[in-house]
Amino acid sequence: MSASVNAEISTTNTKWRNMNILSYNQFDRERLNDMCKVTNAMRAMVATSGGCDLLKGKILNNVFFEPSTRTMCSFETAMQRLGGTTVRILPSYSSSKKGETLQDTLRCLECYGDITVLRHPEKGSVPGVAKYLKKPLLNAGDGVGEHPTQALLDFYTIQNEMDGKVDGLTIVLLGDLKNGRTVHSLARLLMNYDVKLRFVSPESLKMPEYIKEEVQKKLEFTEHENLSDVLKEADVLYVTRVQKERFENEEDYLKVKGTFDINKATLSIAKENMIIMHPLPRVGEIHEDVDSDPRAAYFRQMENGMYVRMSLLALCLKGRGDD
C-alpha cells in the first residue's frame, strides 16, 4: 500500500469512517480539502503502481436501478484498484421485480458487503433508506434530486484545473437545469466558495426555485437563455444534456433538445484558460470538434471520477473514526 495514501487517510482533519455520503450539505471546505488531499494521493499512487491492497477483503455492493456507465464503472474500478471486490445488482436481477422493498433489498445486501453504492429513480429514496442500514451508503443519484459524488468529482476537477483556485471564479451551468441532479448538487456545493454562478437554460428547464432560494443566501447568480450573454466572462462552462427520460412526452423533449450547440466557433469568444466540463453522456450539445481543444476537460473530469471515488471508498471504510 502506498505510504502517502495511508498517511493522508489517517491524518484528515475530519472524521469519515462509516460515513454515509448522501448530499452536498455534508461537505464544508475542511472536508472538501481532506477529500482533495486523499484524491491527489490516489492519483499519484495509481500513476506509480496501478493500485494497492488498502481495501483487500472488502466488498462493494453496486446497486443501480437506473442506467449508468461512468458512475457504476468508476466505482467498480475504484474498488478494484484498492484491492477490493464488487457485486453488481441491476433491476433485472433484483428481487424488487418480485415486489421486495428497497429497504429489504439493501438490508440483505449489506449482510454480504461492506459498503453500498445506490442509484434509484425516486427523488429522496437514497437518503430515505440510509436510516435502515448499519454500513456506509453512497448516493449515486436519486432521480432528479442529487448526485453528490458527481458534484465532488466536479469540484475536484475545477480545483485541479484551476491550480487550486476556486474563489473568484465565474461558473456557467448550462442545459437541463430543471432535471439535472448533477447541477443541483454542484451549485449548492459551491456555496462553500466565493464564486459567481450563471444559470443558462430554456425557460422550461430553469433551475428549480428551491435550489435558487438556497443558493442566493450565499452566492450571486443570474439567469439567462442565451450562452452568448455570459460566455466571455466564464472560467468554467459546465454543460448538461437535456434529459429525455425525465419528459412525459417526446414532443416536449424535441422542443428543447437542440437548444444549445457548442462547437469550435462558439468558443471563439471564450477565455483561453476557460475549461469545459460535462458529466456525460452528451447527446449533441458539444460537438466532437471541441474534443481536441485544450479547454475541453470532460474526459479528464471522467478520469478524476475514479480517483475521487477511490478516496471516498477508502475514507468511508478506513478513515478517521471515533477510536
Name each model-derived stretch.
Residues A3-A7:
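Short hydrophobic alpha-helical segments enriched in small aliphatic residues
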